[in-house]
């Protein structure tokens, strides 16, 4: 009786694994090169990275991306907005305009973040913190396997107060668009996808990737909230 139960469990697992393999064969995975072509002008080398932080950047160079010698730090929060449920290659993301929540009115002073090196450590170049400046540090955020690019840089305000404790340090933000894979969703490959990626697909279906908008903060500024 016990052996029959064990056999039933084994057969069930084999069936599940077989189904997963069939799904993988049925739904083709887009290559990094194809995703980079779909992302197109939305890729900003100052704020995004395809490769893990600290690794050589040859892969990015092969994809046609080259990092700027002067990279602005920024921060990405956890809020993300799906700007479209259609395939990313079918949507002109530059034409999509989202209404942003109005931020509190603020009066800001001229600010500058502390200089940082590539790995997020402050540079010791005789830098002296000024009263109207907010010190900050850079972190890397891993968005996970379902995002492209996967890695984005973030800045965290270290100081809470500025201008002799009369003003507050506040991150200044804007938005970037990245690709997000909708897990469990496949879509038929069409001529437009083939034209953009120039990829030869062996399957008729591929994974569905959509545009997602993420708010990022690129600096810390000294402000007085009303």
UniProtKB/Swiss-Prot annotation:
The keyword Secreted applies. Its main location: secreted. The keyword Transcription does not apply. Keywords: Developmental protein, Secreted, Signal. It is found in: Secreted. Pfam families: Noggin (PF05806). Residues 1-19 form the signal peptide. One of its GO terms (cellular component) is extracellular space. One of its GO terms (biological process) is torso signaling pathway. InterPro entries: Cystine-knot_cytokine (IPR029034), Insect_Hormone_Regulators (IPR052876). SUPFAM superfamilies: Cystine-knot cytokines. It comes from the Eukaryota. One of its GO terms (molecular function) is signaling receptor binding. Disulfide bonds: none annotated. Required for activity of the tor receptor, could be a ligand of tor. Involved in specifying terminal body pattern. Belongs to the noggin family. PANTHER family: PROTEIN TRUNK, PROTHORACICOTROPIC HORMONE, ISOFORM F. This is Protein trunk. The gene is trk.
